[in-house]
Amino acid sequence: MNKTEFIAFMTEHGHHHKHQGHKSFTKADAEKALNWVLESIISATKHQHSVNITGFGSFGIQSRKSREGRNPKTGAKMTIPAYKQPVFKAGSKLKEACNNK
């Protein structure tokens, strides 16, 4: 499911809750909310903060050391520089949902 499909899913899911007394929201509202959450997670991790959403999972940064590697085309040795890797660790509720528990 890509972002556009997910926004449509959020909107349809919102209409499902309308019957339970909740207000529905538009695709524009869903896109704005999703963008705000994603931008907030990116900003927090960029500033070296981890984001923990209980049950869902945690977003963070892992530092990777520089290391030796090889150019796949030429086979020549090369140094792969150190870098920071974004990471996500799934929480218990997400794991349970994926395993139909």
From Swiss-Prot:
Annotated GO MF terms: DNA binding; structural constituent of chromatin
Domain of life (superkingdom): Bacteria
Family annotation (Pfam families): Bac_DNA_binding
GO cellular component terms listed in the entry, alphabetical order: cytosol
CDD domains attached to this UniProt entry: HU
UniProt keyword annotations, A-Z: DNA condensation, DNA-binding
Keyword DNA-binding: yes
Keyword DNA-binding: yes
GO biological process entries: chromosome condensation
Oligomeric and partner information: Homodimer.
PANTHER family with a match to the protein in the record: DNA-BINDING PROTEIN HU (PTHR33175), DNA-BINDING PROTEIN HU-BETA (PTHR33175:SF3)
Protein family per UniProt: Belongs to the bacterial histone-like protein family.
Stated role: Histone-like DNA-binding protein which is capable of wrapping DNA to stabilize it, and thus to prevent its denaturation under extreme environmental conditions.
Name of this chain's protein: DNA-binding protein HU
